[in-house]
Each structure stands twice: as structure tokens, then as C-alpha cells.
Regions:
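Flexible domain-boundary/linker segments
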Residues: 27, 70, 84-88
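Short cysteine-rich loop/turn motifs with clustered Cys
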Residues: 2-48, 71
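A generic structural micro-environment signature
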Residues: 31, 40, 56-62, 111
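Polybasic, low-complexity binding patches
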Residues: 60-65, 76-119
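Histidine-centered catalytic micro-motifs used for acid/base chemistry in nuclease
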Residues: 45-58, 62-73
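Generic structural signal for short, solvent-exposed loop/turn connectors between secondary structure elements
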Residues: 1-2, 59
Length: 119
């Protein structure tokens, strides 16, 4: 899968928000707003990156179920943590704010990744 294909896959699986243009605005797994055009832009509060749910350092790869769009500060905050991780950015209304929260990868995805990676 090319980098562009990974980007498109992740965007297409990010959370669609009713009332917003799904082709340009979505939310990440932590509920932070992301703008499609801001991919890779760490100078934007709406910038985002491709996250590996099961980190590469632990043996993860570009298996599609292991990829998702994540606001860049949330991706940095998550780092190599799995299955529990911390976010740094949350949405409040139609804006992003700095706010930490704890998340756990859902059980069904953990099971699927465990089977795929034989962990």
C-alpha cells in the first residue's frame, strides 16, 4: 500500500460528523477534529497523521485494520502505547482544545489484531 493509499484508507475510515462535509472534515478516534487538507501539518490544530493502532515497534505493520487517522498531537501522545493510551486533544463544539483523556482500543479490534499478529 502506498503512502497515498494509506492516507485515503485512514481518511475514509475516520468518523463522519453529521452536518459537516465528509470530504474535508472528520474526527479521529479520540474525537478531535481533523481536516483532510491538513494531512501531515504539525503546525495545524486540525493536522493529522496515519496511526498504527498496534505500534510498529511492537510488530505492527500496514495491515489495514491497524491503520487509522489521528490528530497529530494525539498520535504523539499515544506514541507506542497499546492497548491503553492517552490523548492530548479533544473537540469542544466545533473546535479542538488541549485536554487529556484515557482510551483503550476496543476489544473486538484488539482480538482481530492479536489474531493477525499472533500475539
Amino acid at each position: 500500500m502506498t503512502d497515498e493509499e494509506k492516507k485515503e484508507y485512514c481518511w475514509n475510515h475516520a468518523q463522519i460528523v453529521e452536518g459537516y462535509d465528509k470530504d474535508s472534515i472528520r474526527k479521529d478516534a479520540c474525537g478531535a477534529w481533523i481536516f483532510k487538507a491538513h494531512y501531515g501539518m504539525r503546525d495545524s490544530v486540525f493536522g493529522w497523521e496515519v496511526d498504527h493502532v498496534f505500534p510498529v515497534i511492537l510488530g505492527g505493520d500496514d495491515f489495514t485494520k491497524n491503520l487509522r487517522a489521528m490528530q497529530w498531537k494525539n498520535n504523539v501522545s499515544k506514541g507506542d502505547d497499546y492497548p491503553e493510551y492517552m490523548s492530548a486533544i479533544q473537540s469542544e463544539g466545533n473546535k479542538n482544545i488541549e485536554k487529556e483523556a484515557s482510551y483503550t482500543v476496543n476489544d473486538s479490534l484488539q482480538q482481530e489484531l492479536s489474531e493477525y499478529y499472533n500475539k
